[in-house]
UniProtKB/Swiss-Prot annotation:
It comes from the Bacteria. The lineage of its organism: Bacteria, Pseudomonadati, Chlorobiota, Chlorobiia, Chlorobiales. This is Ribosome-binding factor A. Signal peptide: none annotated. It is found in: Cytoplasm. Pfam families: RBFA. One of its GO terms (molecular function) is ribosomal small subunit binding. Belongs to the RbfA family. Monomer. Binds 30S ribosomal subunits, but not 50S ribosomal subunits or 70S ribosomes. GO terms for cellular component: cytosol. Keywords: Cytoplasm, Ribosome biogenesis.
Amino acid sequence: MSIRTEKVASLLQQELGAILEKELPRSSALSTVVDVKVTADLGIARIYVSVIGTEEQRTAIMAWLHDETKYLRKLLSAKIRHHFRRIPEIEFFEDRIYERASRIEQLLREVRKAPEQHD
């Protein structure tokens, strides 16, 4: 990734995080913009969102993001239009890295306990 695309990705992550904090429907689930990948031509931004909550909450939030993509892009445009001639199209993807990390930690704890049980 070039320095330009990294800067764009960082700005998009920051601004979208702020937008989602205000715009996401209130629920007990925690949502975070984890990463943003921007194509070399700056035409598409892939937004990776982590949702910590029940499966139902994750599904609902991801569905809302997909349904409201145009609206969210419009809000983003209003915030960053002075930085760009053209605002990238945005695509949302769910990132379950925290869920996977939690599962790995759980497995490691079980492995550490296993030798103690055999003594």
